[in-house]
Regions:
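Short acidic-hydrophobic surface loop/beta-edge motif
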Residues: 1, 11, 22, 106-111
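Extreme N-terminal starter segment of soluble prokaryotic enzymes
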Residues: 4-8
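Active-site HxH/HxHxD metal-binding segment of metal-dependent hydrolases
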Residues: 14-15, 27-30, 37-120, 137
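Residues that form or flank phosphate/diphosphate-binding pockets in enzymes
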Residues: 17, 63-66, 148, 156
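Divalent metal-coordination and catalytic microenvironments
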Residues: 22, 34, 59, 71, ...
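Metallo-beta-lactamase
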Residues: 115, 125-174
Length: 174
């Protein structure tokens, strides 16, 4: 997806998952959303040749976080960067890798120079977050909303998932 100075790259990972690289050409930096595995992310970051300032984790499931140690090692190793700031849910911090910044629903966050809003989209898991970047006209929902529906309810209730989907539905259509 391209919107003015922001380009979002969708990277297939594992057998049925995705990671995202958000590139801000104005700041000359990038951010990552979810890290199922490091390889595709390292390849894209290397291709872009920009520093990654932030890594946003939507929830604690292994298929969204397992690549984090390898990505951080590549950033500080072969890519010659400093470690990226790891951001995730304060309510889920005990199940996430060590966070540099814990956020809560309603917080505003800046990733690679782009302002974003944090939403609680519990249902698939408790503490599941969505990241809305209004200026990029993008929202990262992970397993709370997918092309063919919503994720399975591992921890949350149907009522929580319905509330989460209603919040996402209320976002601007573009």
């Amino acid at each position: 997806m391209v919107n003015s100075s922001v380009t979002i790259y969708t990277l297939p990972c594992l057998s049925d998952n995705y990671a995202y690289v958000i590139h801000n050409s104005v700041s000359g930096t990038a951010a990552v959303v979810d890290v199922p595995e490091a390889g595709p992310l390292v390849d894209k970051i290397s291709e872009l040749n920009v520093p990654v300032t932030d890594i946003f984790l939507t929830h604690h499931h292994w298929d969204h976080i397992d690549g984090l140690p390898d990505l951080q090692a590549a950033l500080t190793g072969s890519l010659g960067q400093v470690p990226a700031r790891v951001i995730g849910a304060k309510a889920d911090a005990h199940r996430l890798p060590a966070l540099d910044k814990a956020v809560s629903p309603g917080d505003r966050l800046t990733l690679c120079g782009i302002e974003g809003d944090i939403y609680d989209v519990s249902g698939h898991t408790l503490g599941h977050l969505a990241l809305h970047l209004p200026s990029a006209k993008a929202v990262f929902t992970a397993d709370s909303l997918m092309a063919m529906g919503c994720g399975r309810l591992f921890e949350g209730s149907a009522a929580q998932m319905w509330h989460s989907l209603q919040q996402l539905r209320a976002l601007p259509q573009d």
